[in-house]
Every structure is written in C-alpha cells, then in structure tokens.
C-alpha cells in the first residue's frame, strides 16, 4: 500500500512539474509599443516623401 502511495506521489509531482512552463512569455509590452510608434513614424515619412518633393518643386518654380 505504501508503494502505491509513493508511485502516486511521484506521478503527481511529475504532472505538476510538466504543466509548468520553464520560460514564461516576456512582459516587455512597453518596448513593443515604442517599437510600433517608431514604425508608424517611419511609414508616415515614407508616405509623405513624394508630397514633400512636389512642394519643393513648386517652391522652386515660384521663385
């Protein structure tokens, strides 16, 4: 009877340890938000590039 209790205890410990993840997900969400803001600024500059070029050309023609 004691042998079956020991086996059950070892099995329960194994299941408990197997269900715990060794490397939890990092909680660096603030850095992801900062990175996303940087990407939005970069994309905005890329999209505004042709418009700025047209304005520069128009200003040069106006002189």
UniProtKB/Swiss-Prot annotation:
One GO cellular component this record assigns the protein to is: extracellular region
**Sites of Leucine amide modification:** 61
The signal peptide here is: 1-22
* UniProt protein name: Hyphancin-3D
Q: Which organism is it from?
A: Hyphantria cunea
Q: What role is this protein assigned?
A: Has antibacterial activity.
Q: Where on the tree of life does the source sit, at the highest rank? A: Eukaryota
Tell me the keywords, alphabetical order. Answer: Amidation, Antibiotic, Antimicrobial, Immunity, Innate immunity, Secreted, Signal
Q: What is the lineage of its organism?
A: Eukaryota, Metazoa, Ecdysozoa, Arthropoda, Hexapoda
GO process terms (BP)? antibacterial humoral response; defense response to Gram-positive bacterium; innate immune response
Would you identify the family this protein belongs to, as annotated? Belongs to the cecropin family.
Q: Record's Pfam families?
A: Cecropin
Tell me where in or outside the cell this protein is found.
Secreted
**Which residues are assigned to the propeptide feature?**
23-26
């Amino acid at each position: 009877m004691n042998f079956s209790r020991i086996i059950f205890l070892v099995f329960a410990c194994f299941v408990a340890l197997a269900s715990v993840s060794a490397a939890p997900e990092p909680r660096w969400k603030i850095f992801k938000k900062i990175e996303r803001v940087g990407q939005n600024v970069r994309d905005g500059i890329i999209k505004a590039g042709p418009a700025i070029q047209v304005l520069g050309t128009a200003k040069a023609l106006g002189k």
